[in-house]
Amino acid sequence: MQRAAKCALRPDLSVVFCPSSVRNCRAVNRVNGSVLCRRYSVLPPPRDEEEKAMLDRMLRVDHAGEYGANRIYAGQMAVLGRTQTGPLIQVLNHMWDQEKIHLEKFNEILGEHRVRPTLLLPLWNVAGFALGACTALLGKEGAMACTVAVEESISEHYNSQIRTLMETDPERYTELLQIIKEFRDDEIEHHDTGLEHDAESVPGYFLLKTAIQIGCKAAIYISQRI
């Protein structure tokens, strides 16, 4: 009880960055399979300004990506949640719940290490929701095509970060690598789920997928820098 009280009284820096759906004072440590009402460091202190800049860019864009993914699922559910899509709603909710965990973890890390989120969060808020809603208007196949395109882009981006950290100092970044690898695996699972639910059957699939992925790459590039 004392520990819970102390945790409840501790200022929660993540509220600066997180949407209302993310719970305060609740960090999810999925690597260890437990829910902890505490903050703990997954990053060592940066050795120099160059390392700090690298980590800031990495965390900023990861947070932006997970924020955007949450808004996409929100847009999809706003449309499909009112239709008779059957089991797909459970599938979307499962994937969205995982994205909420991802976002919550990056909220925690940004708050702890005083990393500024991208200034474009208001834009990604609107753009993500609009993308989710518009693709859902194409039907469940359109929503799944969006999922495939976005999750493929995010998993490739996470793979690039994993390579960078492995080449830099894997022992120094052990915990961060664990988190990114687990989140990468979730994104791959979402990608495969989209394919299993007829993503490729939407008219103009490859054109739609290409357009979405161009947007994702642009968002990644901009969010690292602004």
Residue ranges and their predicted role:
Residues 2-226:
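Non-heme di-metal
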